[in-house]
Every structure is written in structure tokens, then in C-alpha cells.
Amino acid sequence: MKQSSVVDLLLLLLAIALLATPAFSDLVLSKVERRIDVTSQIARVTKTLKVVNSGSESVSEFALTFPKFLGNNLAYLSVAPSEGKGKSKRTLVNLSVREADQKGLPDSISVYSVALPKPLSKGDTLTLEVVAAFTNVLQPFPEKITQGEIHLVMLQESAQYLSPYAVESQSLSIKLPNARIESYTKFENTKLQGSELKYGPYKNLQSYSYSPIVVHFESKAAFAVAEKLVREIEVSHWGNVQVTENYNVVHRGAQLKGEFSRLDFQARPNPRGASAFRHLLARLPPRAHSIYYRDDIGNISTSEMKSDSKKTELLIEPRFPLFGGWKTFFTIGYGLPLTDFLFASEGKRFLNISFGSPILDLVTEKLIVQVVLPEGSKDISVTTPFAVKQSQEIKYSHLDIAGRPVVVLEKNNVVPDHNQHIQVYYKFSNINLLSEPLMLISGFFILFITCIIYTRADISISKSSPSYLAKLQWDEVLATLQEVQSIVQKCLATHDKLEASLRDLSRTGDIQTCKAARKSTDSLLKDLSKELKPLLGFLQSFPSASHISPKVEELVVKEKELQEKLMAKHTTVVEGYEKKSSGRDIENRIASQQQKIIALRQEIEDLLEFIDEI
């Protein structure tokens, strides 16, 4: 409980500082009713303040104060006057609220100034309804828990209403998620009834009265926080508004300590996964369609959708349960009918659509809303019910020329209370609707005309032009080279047959068959040589083949030399067999010839490869 002691000390110092702070004016709060709802991760505070002017001068502003640790986490604040009582009570339009000057006030408080609808004269009364939403004020305690432990959080507040005005009567009620409370600060007139904790009523409190309280209780709420959410709203005047939302969600509750057991979680999900959340609920507009839910892996089929005439609910279930500190990334998208959200007013069109996330009880640390308007939109303006950072960009899509204007709205610390409608006004000419269809028609027309011209026009090169004649000559050169290659390959194949006859001779000893093979080979090689002569002359007649002819001539010479060496080898082997020489003696006699044959064969192969590359 060391952390609790430090908190108590800080709250005590705050109370001491407040006692020395002067009152703002002669206003008196005759009755204060505060209600704090902590059933979700967001602490929602509702206050009913009955204000009386007990001074002699009129007052036009009213001050709201919060402890600094609450003011730093204030996400939403609205103040509105109310009239009537009970069922006839009605709340009027919200008043203007701004941060007040802290001059003369301690740093331990945050002050906001509310502009009253009209000056409050002496003796007049006014009832104000204040709604405030705070994030990060429900602190997990302990900060780390195991999978099987319950999730406990701690709330710090004041039993007495912190105000720069004297309070005649005030009460506080805290609505808890359930009746399981570990501990709470006890004062006079403190009562616990089920899941509701009540303090007061307390009478005749001085200005800046402060009595710190700490409530330690169980919370099963989903502490889902979107570290970043990008909502892209694309408007198409052809009948659709497409919404795409990219979420980066983290569980900001007590972090998981130890290992996660999927088996225990599946068998006993309630006691073994009480601190985790398994799904989120998104409440979409009633006529949403074409809904999808996916992540980086692909479509997630575990989502469920229910729809009726008033709403469409999408139950988002991540691929795994989220414990404290765990993150997930996903995208949801849906289409909306244009007629439900796009309207016309005073010569302008305006988009009327919600600002925040449709996911219930989601806290968004950074929200970026990108409204993509049709190409040609101009005179763009935005109306929002609260302050946001605005900028404009250009986005290029299919068939765009100048690009589509994009209105970018940014806001930090966003809660569901911010899910109010914004209006994006712009001017757009109906003629621009025809730009993309006309572009498509023009593209197909140009393609059609091009095809007609291509099929009917003679785009071949003139047969009398030098380039055409040079191409013809080069084609003839290439054809001649292919013939030379073919003849030389036939010669090499004939050489192989001659070598094969020698191998048969060594195996069978049939000299006559070997001589017959020699005679057939000799006749075939002579015929092939005759075919080569006119081809060489033909190549030499073309100037374009001047760099090739020497290689071809060298190829023919090498092949002729190879023929002679093979014939000499063949003669030597046959004579050896006729004289009945030994095999070793014959091999010794042809050894030098064989080396030359191998070298010539390799040179011929290299020349053929060179010609083939041409």
C-alpha cells in the first residue's frame, strides 16, 4: 500500500493549498448533486449545480474547478442550463466553456470559465448540468496480475465538491460495476448500497473544500484504447459514402504477469481470463452495408452483425483475447447511402456525419478523420461542436486529374461523448459529375480509333528505302550462316561415324567393313565441301558480312584440316591391323594425330558458338 500512502500525501497537500485560495465571486451553490459512473474505463461525472447570486453585482461567468490530476485527463466537458424539475426537466443548449487564467491560483487545480446565457443578477438562481468525461483516472492496482486474478482498479476523488464558491448542500454517488469492493474511504454519512457508494449530504462547505477519497474495486470493463485511429470518409456523388477505419488497439488494464495458457482460458474463460476482453461492439448507422472486418493476415470471420431499422451492430472479435499490455491491429469498413448523410443548403452541399469511432466505450489517444470530397469541390469549410486541428490535403485516385480535396481533422484524447455530428460544407458543380464518365468514353473512343488506324494503315517500311534493303541483306546473311552451320554440323557427324568404324574394327577385326565405311565417309565429305564453296562466295559479296566472313573461312579451313587428320588416323589404324601390329603399337603411332584432332574439334566448336551468337 506504499502507492496509496503517496497518493494520500499528495491529496493532503492539495487540500492545504486550496484552503489558502480566495473565492471567485459572491456566487453560492445552494445545492450540488454529483454522480460518478465508473462502470467502464471512462469516469463520467454528471453534476447538477444550483447557482445563487448572493452579491450585489451581476455575474456573467461561472468557474468550474478540478484537481490537477483530473484536469490533465479531462477528455470531454459540457455545461448547459436546465429548466423545470423531475420529468418536466429539460436541458438547453450547451454554454461556451474555456480554460480560465490560472493567475493567483495554485498549480494543483484546473479552472474552466463558463459564459452564462445572461448575467445573473442579485438574488437570481440558475441550474447548470455539467457533464465531464475523464480518461486514465481508473488506475490498475495492482499494475500486474496473472491470468487467473481479478482486475482491480483505483479511483481517486473528493467526497466534497471542489469549487471556488461556498456550497450549502452537496452529495456524491459513485456507480460501480458491481458490488465487489476491496476498500473505500469512509467519512460521516458514507453509505454502500449494492454497487453504489454514497457520500453526504454535507452542509455549509467553504469554498475549495476538499476531502480526498480512494475507492478500490473490481472492474470487468474492456480497457480498450486506440493508440491511433484513422477514419477515412470518402464521398461519391454516385450514391455512396465509403468509411474505412484503421485501428491500433491496446489493452490498458493491468498487465499480464506470467505465461498465457490457451487451454485454461478455453476451459474456464471467466475465472481464467477475467481481465481480458474478447470482443468489441461497434454501433454503425442503420443502413450500413458492404461491411468488412480484417487485419494484416486477411478477413476475420469471427465477427457477427445484427441490424434493424434503428442501428447496425457489428460484434468485433479479434483473433486472440487481449490481456493487459497486448495489442491488435485491424480495419473495419462499410458503405453508407449518400441520401442519409449528404444535404444541400444555401447553394452548398454539406456532409453531416459522426466524428468519433462507432466502437462503444473506446478511448482514442489520437484520432485522424480524413474526409475525401469529390474532385472539383471548392469553398470548403467545416463545423465541429468542439475544437479540432484542421488541415487540407490532395488525394489522387482513379481517373483524377487535379486530385480530390481531403479535409483532415485531428483530436487527441477522444471518448464516445465526442461521437457527435460534424458538417463539411463545399460547393460542387453537377458538370463535374460527368468528367470521369466522359474521360472513360474518350479513352475507349481513342483506343477504338487507334485500332482502326493500325489495322487499315500500311505502316511497313518502304521496299526501296536503304534501311529496308539493308534489312533484307542482313536476313540473307543470317540465312547463309545457318546453312554453313548446318553443313559443318553434318561434317562433324560424318567424322563421328568414321571414328565409330575404327571402334568397330578394334572390336571385330573386320578390315573390309572399316574400309567400306571409309569410302562412304570420304564421298559424303566431298559432297558437303562442294556445298560450302558457293556459300562462302555469297557471304564475301555482302559488305554487311565483312566482319563475319573471316570467321566462317577459318571454320571451313579448320574443318578441312580436321578431315585430313581423321583420314590419316584411319589409314594408320587400318594398316596396323593389316600388318597385325599390337594395339599398343597402333595407339603409339596415332597418339600425336589424336591430340591434334581433339584440338581442332574444340576450335571448330568455339567458332560454331561464335556464329550462333550472331
UniProtKB/Swiss-Prot annotation:
Compartments, as annotated in UniProt: Endoplasmic reticulum membrane
Keywords: Endoplasmic reticulum, Glycoprotein, Isopeptide bond, Membrane, Signal, Transmembrane, Transmembrane helix, Ubl conjugation
GO cellular component, one term: endoplasmic reticulum
Pathway: Protein modification; protein glycosylation
GO biological process, one term: protein N-linked glycosylation
InterPro entries xref list: Ribophorin_I (IPR007676)
Pfam families with a match to the protein in the record: Ribophorin_I
Domain of life: Eukaryota
Sites where a glycan is attached: 94, 299, 352
Transmembrane parts of this sequence: 433-453
Ranges in the topological domain labelled Cytoplasmic: 454-614
Membrane topology annotation: Single-pass type I membrane protein
Residues spanning the signal sequence: 1-25
Glycyl lysine isopeptide (Lys-Gly) (interchain with G-Cter in ubiquitin) crosslink residues: 311
Lumenal-side positions: 26-432
Protein purpose: Subunit of the oligosaccharyl transferase (OST) complex that catalyzes the initial transfer of a defined glycan (Glc(3)Man(9)GlcNAc(2) in eukaryotes) from the lipid carrier dolichol-pyrophosphate to an asparagine residue within an Asn-X-Ser/Thr consensus motif in nascent polypeptide chains, the first step in protein N-glycosylation. N-glycosylation occurs cotranslationally and the complex associates with the Sec61 complex at the channel-forming translocon complex that mediates protein translocation across the endoplasmic reticulum (ER). All subunits are required for a maximal enzyme activity.
Family: Belongs to the OST1 family.
Quaternary structure and partners: Component of the oligosaccharyltransferase (OST) complex.
The protein's name: Dolichyl-diphosphooligosaccharide--protein glycosyltransferase subunit 1A
Native source organism of the sequence: Arabidopsis thaliana
